[in-house]
Swiss-Prot record:
Major subcellular site: cytoplasm
Organism (species): Paracidovorax citrulli (strain AAC00-1) (Acidovorax citrulli)
UniProt GO molecular function: ATP binding; D-alanine-D-alanine ligase activity; metal ion binding
Protein name stated in the entry: D-alanine--D-alanine ligase
Pfam families linked: Dala_Dala_lig_C, Dala_Dala_lig_N
Biological classification of the source: Bacteria, Pseudomonadati, Pseudomonadota, Betaproteobacteria, Burkholderiales
Gene of this entry: ddl
Cofactor or coenzyme needed: Mg(2+); Mn(2+)
Keyword Cytoplasm: yes
Length: 334
């Protein structure tokens, strides 16, 4: 599945005037600005007529009045990858990168995502939805220690706590509930942390190389993700070939199950006791910073950051456009 990306010719002129949506008003604004800045520079280097656009500073209706032909969504978190901006772009009739309205909304909600994956028979850790510190303590009793407590609809490990004792439950619940009234308690899978990007859509969706993540003392938090160099990323991942292929198969199935398109990145834990992979979540607007993982995975198969950005942009589409043809001459979303 990761043998190589399909060969494609992209007519830069056919892309038209492009808005790189960045910033926004979520808790991940700072990271979004870094992602968007990198994408903007890469697209301009390839001759694309690309411009920065911050939805928290300008009304989205200006995209139409200013003649933008498509959008590269580099927004993270609420209003950027939860179906909100995707719905607005559908109404404006401006094609955009990444999954559509429904897939974006579902993937942003970790609980709904896990329910669908579980229904489809895909492996994901056991969980509880809680609404109080007392319920969090009960979840710890049910799921065992350690346990992960996190907001249902945030990313970048924001609001996340690894709980190892009942005394931590109240503080963990309070932190998570600051970001979302729906708090997820999830069984902790002891083992190796990996992540794997997916590009394409439907039968054409394909996984990129798996990345194995080794964080200091297992602490892969917001700071270590974006602002330090202490976390180690292994790509090639160094896993047995059969394990990597199984992870790639699993993430493509998870991607298709949620009806994603364009691109996404799924996080997986490999349980140490039996080497079984478990899906944690899927990110439908992955980071594109200097520390980000999709560009790292693409580089491992010979695809540069600039080429990756161009390919993602060329696949911009709309839910409402059946049979649309993109700048690479491929059919759009069905």
């Amino acid at each position: 599945m990761a043998a190589g990306l399909p060969e494609t010719e992209i007519d830069v002129r056919a892309l038209g005037k492009v808005a790189v949506l960045m910033g926004g008003d979520s808790a991940e604004r700072e990271v979004s600005l870094m992602s968007g800045g990198g994408v903007l520079q890469a697209l301009r280097a390839r001759g694309v007529d690309a411009h920065a656009f911050d939805p928290s500073q300008s009304d989205l209706s200006e995209l139409k009045s200013h003649g933008y032909a498509r959008c590269f969504i580099a927004l993270h978190g609420r209003h950027g990858e939860d179906g909100t901006v995707q719905g607005a772009l559908e109404l404006l009739g401006i094609p955009y990168t990444g999954p559509g309205v429904m897939a974006s909304a579902i993937a942003m909600d970790k609980i709904m995502t896990k329910r669908i994956w579980r229904f489809e028979g895909l492996p994901t850790p056991d969980w509880r939805l809680v609404s109080s510190a007392a319920e969090t303590a009960q979840a710890l009793e049910d799921l065992g220690s350690p346990m992960i407590v996190k907001p249902s609809r945030e990313g970048s490990t924001i609001g996340l706590t690894k709980v190892t004792s009942p005394g931590q439950c109240e503080q963990a619940y309070r932190l998570a509930s600051r970001y979302d009234p729906e708090v997820l308690c999830e069984q902790f899978i002891e083992g190796e942390e990996t992540t794997c990007p997916v590009l394409g859509q439907g039968a054409g969706a394909h996984a990129l190389p798996v990345i194995r993540i080794v964080a200091p003392e297992g602490n892969y938090d917001y700071q270590n993700k974006y602002f330090t160099d202490v976390t180690q990323y292994h790509c090639p991942c160094g896993l047995p070939e059969q394990e990597e292929r199984e992870i790639q198969r699993l993430v493509v199935e998870a991607f298709r199950t949620l009806q994603c398109r364009g691109w996404a990145r799924a996080d997986i834990m490999i349980r140490a006791s039996d080497r079984k992979p478990f899906l944690l979540e899927i990110n439908t607007s992955p980071g594109m910073t200097g520390h980000s993982l999709v560009p790292m995975s693409a580089r491992a198969m010979g695809v540069s950051y600039e080429e990756l950005c161009l390919r993602i942009l060329a696949g911009a589409s709309l839910d409402a456009r059946q049979g649309q043809v993109d700048a690479a001459g491929h059919p759009g979303a069905a």
